[in-house]
Design a protein with these regions (language model features):
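Conserved ATP-binding subdomain of kinase catalytic cores across diverse folds
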Residues: 1, 5-14, 71-297
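Short Lys/Arg-enriched alpha/beta "domain-start" segment
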Residues: 19-67
């Protein structure tokens, strides 16, 4: 049975009609070459300004982009699945916002989920291999690398501060590993989320801001206090900048199985309320007609 368009689940992604006419970048060997000329200029001036307004998590869709700057990029993951952890600064109408966008690589003919190709932003030629630069969050290898980073207390040095992967005591108890299932909750939201092993939700924070993050602070406090009726905090990825301010990049929490999300719950309750109202209205109308019939008799 085929679902109608308005019945598609929340994780549904419209298939790409055709591959865009991407700019082709040339790399000799390393992903870090994306940060060097001429690749950097091509990404900042052409690829990213065209790609960002199509993303649901990008807050500046209604304003023309003035400039895009890649703030930093640091190598992460294994050599078979190269990734650059990165943040970009976008200036529109005199206001600058910072977003997290990890860059990943996939072979153009790679067989697998459609999402990495749908989120691609540039074509790349590396020696004899042709592929695509995409949002690394769409790659399962990246998700597994982040989980491993938390488990190993990985620390990365970047030009804008130290990036720390930190677990809580709760994470080890889950026994998650390389074989744990990775399941995306939704293609894109204001942030990006994925479920690992049906027990952990990893959320990548898209719009990055310095200072205490309320979700992390509350989750850490309630988990430490042993509060049972929450998703426990399992880990985090934080960049500490030159001013000593923390910038939350990712947060891992326990996954609570449920029957849909808040949007579906709201829709279902509205539907039931409308149905009840219509039923009551029909009942009153029937009583009115019956009363008229009795009067005429």
């Amino acid at each position: 049975v085929l679902a109608a368009e308005n019945q598609m689940p929340s994780w549904h992604v419209e298939p790409a009609q055709s591959m865009p006419d991407f700019t082709t970048l040339v790399l000799k060997k390393r992903m870090e070459e994306l940060l060097e000329e001429p690749c950097r200029t091509s990404l900042e001036h052409t690829s990213l300004p065209a790609w960002l307004p199509k993303r649901r998590w990008f807050a500046g869709k209604d304003t023309a982009i003035d400039t895009v700057r890649i703030a930093y990029g640091v190598r992460f993951g294994d050599p078979q699945h190269p990734v650059l952890l990165s943040e970009i600064e976008v200036t529109s109408a005199g206001h600058t916002s910072r977003y997290q966008l990890p860059f990943g690589f996939i072979a153009e003919d790679q067989v697998g989920p459609a999402l990495p190709q749908q989120l691609a932003l540039a074509r790349v030629r590396r020696v004899r291999q042709v592929g695509l630069i995409t949002d690394a969050f769409s790659l399962e290898a990246f998700i597994r690398a982040v989980l491993q980073g938390m488990q190993n207390n990985t620390v990365l040095e970047s030009s804008e501060g130290e990036i720390r992967f930190a677990p809580t005591a709760q994470l080890e108890k889950l026994g998650l590993g390389a074989e744990s299932e990775v399941r995306y909750l939704s293609a894109e939201q204001s942030n990006s989320s994925v479920v690992v092993g049906n027990s952990l939700v990893l959320k990548l924070i898209r719009k990055v801001a310095s200072g205490v993050h309320p979700e992390l602070e509350m989750s850490a406090y309630l988990t430490e206090a042993g509060f049972a009726n929450i998703s426990p905090l399992l880990g985090s990825v934080i960049r500490r900048d030159a001013q000593g301010e923390d910038n939350l990049l990712m947060i891992a929490q326990g996954y609570l199985s449920n029957q849909g999300d808040a949007w579906e719950w709201t829709q279902n309750n509205l539907e039931r309320a409308l149905r009840d109202e219509l039923a009551d209205a029909m009942s009153e109308q029937e009583q009115h007609y019956n009363a008229l019939g009795d009067h005429q008799q």
